[in-house]
Amino acid sequence: LQLLSQDLRTVYGAEASYRLAQYYFDNGDSKDAEHLINEMIETGTPHQYWLAREFILLADINISRKDNFQAKQYLLSLKNNYNADDDIAEMIEQRLKQIGQ
């Protein structure tokens, strides 16, 4: 995944970046997960779905740190700016409900 995630221009690279960040987070390494997410944000990718998934993961990281304010900001920004017809809207609503918003 690390090798694949280096080329964010491809859909496979963007997905690999997300999957690797999710792996880090799931295994208690939120620092490396957040670092990888920030790299993707700074580098950019044309694959908006995987970028949106990374922002949701960033919200999950903040929720795990009890920083619901920051998580809410990421989720509301994504809600207002992401318009594709896929599962992202449902993920956003689940997390907003989870933090009581």
Give the ranges of each region predicted by the language model.
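Acidic, polar-rich low-complexity tracts and alpha-helical solenoid repeat scaffolds
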Residues: 1-101
